[in-house]
């Protein structure tokens, strides 16, 4: 059913996140009446339509696996690591951290090629969207975990003057990545969808 948010009985309440922002809200329906003309599709088939919408949403969210963290030398993961961990011969000084970043960037490149291949093949929103959404959001969380690690004690500040604006932005973005793996269906839900609809595993 399409419901007009201005209808009597429809109210919303902001949800304050750990970041202090409120981009989401909860909606309440108190004795709301909706005309039958607002029915989309067939009766009792709303979940079928909702699943299609979720597939498109998951496709969109999966791109965070590529877009998050920035690609510039000053804001990207490599630039952050060089600034806070030091640089030797143009490379990140800490060899263990350099290896972790290299592994991350290789996975990111492979993920980008996979998304491009799916696009070139004309793939539409499907259960495979769950694969892209799961991997993309988990990869984005990993990216920010690495950046927070490189920041050291600067990575636990999101207000005040103990960190600069860029450092605080990274911390806030790191917190935001936790929501990426919840919205559009949690990572656990995606794994269930992959098992059932992609791999056809027994339930």
Tell where the protein language model's regions lie, with residue ranges:
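FAD-binding core of flavoproteins
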Residues: 1-79, 196, 201-203
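Alpha-helical interface subdomain recognition
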Residues: 55-203
């Amino acid at each position: 059913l399409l419901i007009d948010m201005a209808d009597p009985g429809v109210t919303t309440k902001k949800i304050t996140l750990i970041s202090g922002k409120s981009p989401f809200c909860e909606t309440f329906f108190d004795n709301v009446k909706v005309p039958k003309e607002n029915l989309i599709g067939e009766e009792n088939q709303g979940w079928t339509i909702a699943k299609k919408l979720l597939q498109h949403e998951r496709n969109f969210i999966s791109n965070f696996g590529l877009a998050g963290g920035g690609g510039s030398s000053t804001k990207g993961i490599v630039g952050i690591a060089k600034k806070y961990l030091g640089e030797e011969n143009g490379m990140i000084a800490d060899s263990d951290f350099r290896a972790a970043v290299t592994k991350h960037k290789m996975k990111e490149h492979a993920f980008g090629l996979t998304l491009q291949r799916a696009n070139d093949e004309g793939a539409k929103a499907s259960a495979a969207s769950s694969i892209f959404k799961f991997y993309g959001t988990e990869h984005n969380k990993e990216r920010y975990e690495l950046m927070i690690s490189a920041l050291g004690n600067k990575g636990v500040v999101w207000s005040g003057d103990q960190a600069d604006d860029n450092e605080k932005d990274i911390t806030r973005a790191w917190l935001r990545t936790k929501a990426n793996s919840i919205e559009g269906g949690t990572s656990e839900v995606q794994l269930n969808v992959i098992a059932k609809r992609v791999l056809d595993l027994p339930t």
